[in-house]
Structures are given as structure tokens and as C-alpha cells.
Amino acid sequence: MLQLSIAFAADYRIERCDNLITVDPSGKRVIKVDLSIKLLTDAAIARFGQYVLSYNAQFAKVDVNSAQTVHADGSTVSVDAAQGIFDRPAPVAIAAPQFSAEHLRIVTFPALAKGDSIRLSYTLADTDTLFPGKFSVQLSFPPIEDYRSANVTLDTPDDMPVAIDARGMHQSADASRDGRRLRSYHYETPPSGPLDEQANTVAWTDIGPVFIASNFSGYAEIAHAYHIRAFDQQQQDDAIRQLAN
């Protein structure tokens, strides 16, 4: 899923951020992201010259569909898939568990200069689900960033009940066809411009535009699903008893 680091909005401009989220009956998601960011300063080049995608390798895979540097004159330089895209485990903090399935897919954009843009298309696909038949997704659009066009489309089975909170976004479509239901939402930074970074006193998911969707009916169902998944691990066996003794 898209995660943009917080930097000064004046350093860059998000020209396009499109998320197409397709969910199957098992709860597995395929998320296609198309992103274009205009880099206005050297600080933005330093920040986005290597674009980092975080994912859980135990439950998902990431494919980079295309990646390009777009120069101010319109010419493009494609990222070398062999030399410019690589994967590594996420760093593990001292206080964190030593085992982690978190991975980083790093895309290195070549020949960047002020006024250029990075253009990236990638797909995040679930290979397994934490809770069978259930899904959730959460995207945020920090109001200190300059979004010229951000779009989210959710494509689910027509008979799958889904709760959606799209605070600060405009619903642009809601239609059903061929057993699927498609809902689309749009956000762009208001004419007054992004907020100053100093205004960040709470989490952006508390005050900024968000898209949150899930087919869980509530916290009670989440707790029940967690209990079912953890049940086998809760059972005692001889090895556990010996350790306890």
C-alpha cells in the first residue's frame, strides 16, 4: 500500500495517486497503485530518489509494473529492473521481535534533477489472508502534502457487505455490474493549499482525509476471528508443559 514520508509539501507535488483495490470472496486483495510525484527541490530528490515500498512477505508480494524518471522536457528514463530495483528485509529494531516478515522493495530512479518527476506503477497482491474471508484497507492523505489528484476505487463482490469511511473524500462513482460492486472516491488539496507541517500534532488518520474499508461488522467479529486463528496456538502440549515446569 502507498506510504509517503512526511517532508515539506513545498519540496514536491503529488500529481497523481491512484489506488485500485480488488477484493475476491476469500478476502484476498490485489492493489494496483499508479503514482506520479514532481520533485521541486534537492531535498525532494534526496527523499524520493529511492522510493521504498513496505510489505509483509508472509502474506503478500509486490511487482513493479513500470518505473520512470520523467524530465521537465517530457523525456523519460526507465528504471533498470535488474540494477535499479531490489528487495531486502526491513531493519529490525532492538525492541522488536527478531523474526519479521516485513520486507522493503526499493526502486532507484536515475538521472533526477529539480523539476523532474518520478512515475511508478506497482501491484501489491495478497498471497494469504490473516482472517479467511475478511479484508481491510487503510489509506491516508496527509493534509501537509499537495495532492493534485488522488483516487481510490474499491472493487468487491456485489454480495460482500463493506463498511467504508472516506472522510474528506468525494464519492465519484458507485455501480454494480457482473456480480461486482465498484465504488470510487476522489481527493485533492483544497485551493488554500497544504497545511504547515507544524500543524501535525496528532495522527493524520485522526484529522486528515482517509479511506478505510473492511468487511468486518465490528470489533466483536474481529475479536472472534482472532480467537479462532489463535486457538491452536493456545493449546498446551507436553513440550509446553515441560518448559513451564
Regions from the language model: what does each represent?
Residues 62-125, 131:
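A cross-kingdom signal targeting lumenal/periplasmic-facing segments of multi-pass membrane
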Residues 35, 116-118, 152:
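Cysteine-centered nucleophilic/redox motifs
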